[in-house]
Every structure is written in C-alpha cells, then in structure tokens.
Amino acid sequence: MIDWVTAVLPCLHVPVDAGRVLSVAPDGSVEWESVKFSRVTGSFQSSISVRSQGSDGNGKATHLYVDGNPSKWLQGHNIVGSDDLNGLMIAFYARMLSLLNIPHHLESYRQVLSGQYELKRVDINYMFELPTLIDVRSWLHAAEFKAKTRHGRPATAKGTLYFGKNSRRWSIKAYSKYDEVNCGKKAHGVPEEIKKTGLVEWSKNKLRLELTLRALQLTDINLNFAKNWSTETAYTVFKEYMGRIEMSGNTLLTDTQVINLPSALRMTYVCWKQGICVTDMVSRATYFRHRKVLKEFGIDIAVTVDRVDNSNVVPLIRVLEAKPASIPSQYDNLIFSSNRVSSF
C-alpha cells in the first residue's frame, strides 16, 4: 500500500497564510524567512502538512507542497490501504482544496489528473503473516542479528528495525503494526470505529515491512513523477528493494573444519566467533578476502555472531520471499478505492 507521500502539486491559488518563520540579524535586518506549513485535518482528525510554493508574478502561488499520509488522511487509518498512488492523490487533492476553500484551477487540476507533478518521497508497505504476535517480535529480534543491507546492520528503536535509517536515498523498516497501534501514542492510534471492525485484531500476527524512497532515489529509478506510477508499481518496487536484505544463516564450523583452515583464516574465524570486531584486527583487503572464503562455509563475518536460535533463520528468509498477507474482503470498505471516492 501507499503510505506517506511528499509531493509538489500544481495549484494556482491565493497563498495559504500560515505565518512565517524569520531569522533576524542583530542589526534588525531579516536574514531569511520561510513560509510555515498549515495542518489540514482530514478523516478522523488525521492531518497533512501543506504549504504554498512558487509565484505567477501576480500575487498567486503556483504549487502546493504537501507532506503526509494520504491513506490515513482519507481512510482514518493506515493499517491496510491502496496501491493506487494516482487515485489516492487525486482524491486527496480534491478534498484538500475544498477544506482550504481554494477554487479549482482547471489547468492545475488537469496536471494532477495526468500525474504531471513531482514526488519527493513515497513510503510503501505491506503486511506479512506469521503464526502469532510472539513470532512477529521474535522475527524482529532475530533479524536484528541476522539481517543486513548495503547500509549495514539494522538499527533498533522501540521494537522497530531500521535499515539505512539516515540514508538520503532509501530505507527499510520492520515492525509490528499491532504493537504500534497499541503503544498509547495518539499519532499511532486508530478511531474506535475502526477498532470495532476487527481490523486491528487482524493485524496482530502481521509483520509490517516498509520501504521509503526519497527524492534522489525516486529520480534515479525514474519514479519522481506520478505519471510514471501504475497500480502495479508499488509492489514491484517494494519487492525489488526487499530483495536487498541479506539474511545470514551462520553456523559454527566443526573442530575438524577449524583445524583445516589456514592459520590466518583460522584466527579471523576464532575472533569472529568470540564476538570480536574483525575489521579492528585485520586490514580492509584481508577482511574482504577472508570474508569471501568463509562464505563458502556458510559464514558471513560481516554479521556479528549472536545467541539467537538458528531455528529463526528459515522463517526470516521465508517471510521475505512470501507474498503479502491477503486482506479479508470484509475490510474492503475500509480501503480507499477510486471507484468509491465519494465514501472517503
């Protein structure tokens, strides 16, 4: 599903007045100023940040810079949602103009309808089914030690796993949506009307995997304009990036195998086994040479040896190879559809 979107939408309009932030020098001169964001509230008190941008030379702004979660804004929740980025943004655009009392500008509207606008960030996520909530938490714990991407090992914070958390291009995070909804924070909660449908309970044994694509990466893969997105794009891109997560199935060598290793390689293996950072012990060239050889034995010294039960390794891999969890038809009316725009 499409989750968070940051976009620059064509919209000729009288600038939305939300105030300004100024930097004033000691002599009283203004060093710089920036227009503040307005918070536009949608369904169930969910809001999106909006700011006027550009100028036509006659006092009107030419674009709206929007930043937020159109799925949650329209649906009241983002537990499940639509892969239709263009449909979501068209419905969001129409509703937003109405709430801001901005008259429709025909040419601007045509541009939005045809996807002629720039995307600065897109988040895509899907749910993957495990037997229980305990299994979801165990998966996250095991992946902390067993998984990595080109960004390296994941960082963890409050039960969420982050791959490339501070990357300016792309990142992945994994977490329990059920735990997030029930963490007690207002921003992550869902309305009682949604809870009563059973959707939150349905998410209890689901692992959430989320891909964030930022401006530089969107440009590189030619998805920085909405016109290049179809309803299949989200899952296709998501699957490709999930394939970048490497899972280690590290197992310890037998005594005979250790004895038969060349002495230098044996020392590297023993240090790794004891939890010592190998990169502190050998040169960069030696590290990569030893890593390549040890990988033939099913050992990746780039992944720290840990005490996690190896029985978790197969589920780690199988989850990433599996298809996202099927959403029961009883929840169809809780998911945005361009065929039912009037209900959102």
UniProtKB/Swiss-Prot annotation:
Q: Which family does it belong to?
A: Belongs to the inovirus G2P protein family.
What InterPro entries does UniProt report for this protein, alphabetically? Answer: G2P, G2P_C, G2P_N
Q: What is this protein called?
A: Replication-associated protein G2P
Per the record, what are the reactions this protein catalyses? ATP + (deoxyribonucleotide)n-3'-hydroxyl + 5'-phospho-(deoxyribonucleotide)m = (deoxyribonucleotide)n+m + AMP + diphosphate
Which GO molecular function terms does the record list? DNA binding; DNA ligase (ATP) activity; endonuclease activity
Task: Note whether Nuclease occurs among the keywords.
Answer: yes
Source domain of life: Viruses
Protein EC = 3.1.21.-, 6.5.1.1
- Organism (species): Enterobacteria phage I2-2
